[in-house]
Swiss-Prot record:
Keywords assigned by UniProt, alphabetized: ATP-binding, Chaperone, Nucleotide-binding, Phosphoprotein, Stress response
UniProt xrefs under CDD domains: ASKHA_NBD_HSP70_DnaK-like
Protein name as annotated: Chaperone protein DnaK
Keyword Nuclease carried by entry: no
HAMAP family: DnaK
Gene Ontology MF, one: ATP-dependent protein folding chaperone
Stretches the record annotates as Disordered: 576-612
Similarity comment text for this entry: Belongs to the heat shock protein 70 family.
Amino acid sequence: MSKVIGIDLGTTNSCVAVLEGGEPTVIANAEGNRTTPSVVAFKNGERQVGEVAKRQSITNPNTIMSVKRHMGTDYKVEIEGKDYTPQEVSAIILQHLKAYAESYLGETVSKAVITVPAYFNDAERQATKDAGKIAGLEVERIINEPTAAALAYGLDKTDEDQTILVYDLGGGTFDVSVLELGDGVFEVRSTAGDNRLGGDDFDQVIIDHLVAEFKKENGIDLSKDKMALQRLKDAAEKAKKDLSGVSSTQISLPFITAGEAGPLHLELTLTRAKFEELSAHLVERTMAPVRQALQDADLSASEIDKVILVGGSTRIPAVQEAIKKETGKEAHKGVNPDEVVALGAAIQGGVITGDVKDVVLLDVTPLSLGIETMGGVFTKLIDRNTTIPTSKSQVFSTAADNQTAVDIHVLQGERPMSADNKTLGRFQLTDIPPAPRGVPQIEVSFDIDKNGIVNVRAKDLGTGKEQNITIKSSSGLSDDEIERMVKEAEENADADAKRKEEIEVRNEADQLVFQTEKTLKDLEGKVDEEQVKKANDAKDALKAAIEKNEIEDIKAKKDELQTIVQELSMKLYEEAAKAQQAEGGANAEGKKADDNVVDAEYEEVKDDETKK
């Protein structure tokens, strides 16, 4: 069976890993980094992904960041006259990760396990699966990020029974899960979280502080200046990271904007204490889901054996201090918070291929599922934190006499009224025989698969007629749309490969022009003028082709010049060989002359002896 890669598709950074020899390994990207920024940019029809896209984000308005925050919504971003959905943008990132995984493995990759925040609802999970499909990946399993982290942490500890709390603070989402490990079984007891809280919010409080301080000093609001704002964002992210290791950091942004008197600079010292004051409300916001997860698992903080921190933002000292205070436990530092989720996904990939044995993963559904019943009430069929896969049925009836159809409104959430919860979908069961209200028996069944994706069925028990739906959100893509996007993604991948080949051909041509000039210089006066002219003409023809940027012409002219340069190089070697021979002959003559020399014996006479 081909390799199944594990992908942590993050809000700010993504990571890919694979199981090799029973051990999960993070695959470094082309720049040698183990994580890749989840950033996509478009420039003159060309797509850029990762570090290169992030670097030019200040000057390129066609840059998309943190798209994960919009998964499962009808959000679209218009770039160069085309609308892109979050699924398409995520697919571009996944294609990039897939490409460098293939380069590392030396084989085609078609299967993946992709992680999502534990608190992702059905629409967000479905959107992630669609993104994988568009990228040309068969998504074997969608697993929760904290669960993946627990897999990576606990793989070599499955013989010990322990309860662990995974605190996952990523770039844009926050999750906490309580799991029990033992006998190779990873069972999720509870999960809670906030999909609108992450490292980006910690950056934002620093940005707001910088904007306020600059406005106080100079009377100019930098938040209205797009270019300045991007520089502030980069500086805030760097300051946040610096303050994890030092107690104060200097933020220096020269020429941030211009005032009436000329250019203005931003110079400010940010202390860790000030940052902790600015972000205290965010740290406190993460504590409510921790308490909720413990309560749902029916555990006290003292019953937790280990706390695992996941996500780059858990390096913030105030976050570590808060979790220690809440649980009474020092967080486990044996895993890299940026990589552990991808490693866990790779292990799950190994479970699927059979490379990892005796490991069973029992995940849970993060939110309750049910339908709308009379009076707009939300009737739960499956409670949150139910182990998946699972199914549940309940019999309902009609609300009015002679009702021949029922609308099934499927919802996900925890609020008692339907209007306050998330609509997953609607469908209708028709042709119910007319009868007094309360007589027809309508069985509604919910089925959640191992990826957390929901199927709902309604059946009239009297007639046996049934209707079912695989839940797709209002923003969900139809099969035709997905197929179109898959095709476009493949075409773009081909275009990217063609563009790469063109760049390589141009680079080789430039190198050949330089090499030709060097060879001609070395052969000056050693070959006849006709050969030199022939080489110069071919070189000029290649330079002209490079200027016109006609790839086929560049290839042809490059091959012509290559042949001439090879002939000239042969001349150069011949000249060198002749010179060596001549030198060898001269040495031999010198040797013959040396043969006539007679060695004479001599006796040293000391001065004191001659004086006697």
